[in-house]
């Protein structure tokens, strides 16, 4: 899954290689910081053509891999 691999890469940038589940919070626990979230948003815009200006966006939805997948699924339903 591209999403999981990208998140693993973001965590690795901070020497965080601890395992995590798809539903585990990553932002609320501090594993991903605001800069990582910006990189994630840019990745989703370029890789999946998600237009965050066109969807009801709550940054908390990017807190887990499953939340990110839900955002992509919602976008695909609207696009």
Locate the predicted segments by residue.
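Thiotemplate assembly-line natural product biosynthesis machinery
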Residues: 1-19, 70-79
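Glycine-rich loop motifs involved in handling phospho/adenylate chemistry
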Residues: 21-33, 56-64
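Conserved catalytic core of two-component sensor histidine kinases
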Residues: 38
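Aromatic/hydrophobic pocket-lining residues that form π-stacking "cages" and hydrophobic walls in ligand
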Residues: 41
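Short C-terminal boundary/hinge segments that cap the last helix of small helical domains
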Residues: 50-52
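C-terminal structural segments of small proteins and small subunits
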Residues: 54-57, 62-78
